[in-house]
Amino acid sequence: MKPDAHQVKQFLLNLQDTICQQLTAVDGAEFVEDSWQREAGGGGRSRVLRNGGVFEQAGVNFSHVHGEAMPASATAHRPELAGRSFEAMGVSLVVHPHNPYVPTSHANVRFFIAEKPGAEPVWWFGGGFDLTPFYGFEEDAIHWHRTARDLCLPFGEDVYPRYKKWCDDYFYLKHRNEQRGIGGLFFDDLNTPDFDHCFAFMQAVGKGYTDAYLPIVERRKAMAYGERERNFQLYRRGRYVEFNLVWDRGTLFGLQTGGRTESILMSMPPLVRWEYDYQPKDGSPEAALSEFIKVRDWV
C-alpha cells in the first residue's frame, strides 16, 4: 500500500489527545495547549502540565513540519534524500514526576516521508519508549519490559530483543560511560515489509507506552520521600539534560530544521542540579542505581 501521511497524522493527533487524557486522569491537573506555526512549513500542538498532583512537568508534543529540502542532520547518513521535499510528523513526550520514587519516562513515535517527481517516495517510521528511574525497583523494570515485549510479539519474536538492544545502545552517555536509564524500545528507519505493517507497529508502540508507565506511577506516587531523595533526583536529572543536548538526534534534527525551540526543549526537567565529583555513600540506595541501570535482560 502507498504510504498515507494523512492517516498517520490523524493517528498521531488522536494519540496526543489520549495520552494527555490518561495523564490528567492520574494527576488531576489539566494540560495547557500552545498551537504554533512553522514559518518554513507546518506547525504543531505543544501541551504542558505543570506542578500537578503527581507530575512536576509533563510535556506531550505533536509536530508536523514540511519543507522543500532536507536538513544536514538527515542527509548525512541518507545521501539519497538530497534534493527531495520532506514531511516529518510525530508525537514526543517526557514526564518528570515530583516523587523521586516515580521514574521519568519518555516516548516518541514518528513518521518521515521524502518525495520528488518521478521517483518512489522514501519513507520510514521510528519511535520507542524508555524509562529513567532514580531508585530501582525490579518489579517495575520487569513490568516495563514485559509490556514492551508483549506488544512486539505479534510482529515477530525477534522484534523485542532487537529494539531493546537498540534502545540500550542509543540511550547511552558516552562521556559518562553509563546508561541513561533501563531502556525499553527504540526503532528507526522502519519501512519493511510494507506500510501497513510498519504503521501497525508504530501504533502499538504509541498505545503501549501508558500501559507500561501508568501502573508504575500508581504503585510509587504515594511513597514518602525527603530532601535526600529529592536532591538525588535533581542530580540525576542532569544526566537527562546532558543526553538531550549532546547526543540526541531528534533534538539536533529539530534545531537544525528551524523547529520550535520551546517545543524541542520541552523535554528538559524544570529543575536540575549538578555537583562536582558527586559520589553516593557506599551501600546507599543512591549508590545502587549505577548497578541497576546496567544493561541486562529483564524478561
UniProtKB/Swiss-Prot annotation:
MF GO annotations: coproporphyrinogen oxidase activity; manganese ion binding; protein homodimerization activity
Catalytic activity: coproporphyrinogen III + O2 + 2 H(+) = protoporphyrinogen IX + 2 CO2 + 2 H2O
EC numbers for this chain: 1.3.3.3
Site feature: Important for dimerization: H175
Primary location: cytoplasm
Subcellular location: Cytoplasm
Biological process according to GO: protoporphyrinogen IX biosynthetic process
Stated role: Involved in the heme biosynthesis. Catalyzes the aerobic oxidative decarboxylation of propionate groups of rings A and B of coproporphyrinogen-III to yield the vinyl groups in protoporphyrinogen-IX.
PANTHER family: COPROPORPHYRINOGEN III OXIDASE, MITOCHONDRIAL (PTHR10755), OXYGEN-DEPENDENT COPROPORPHYRINOGEN-III OXIDASE, MITOCHONDRIAL (PTHR10755:SF0)
Protein name in the entry: Oxygen-dependent coproporphyrinogen-III oxidase
Source organism: Escherichia coli O139:H28 (strain E24377A / ETEC)
Gene: hemF
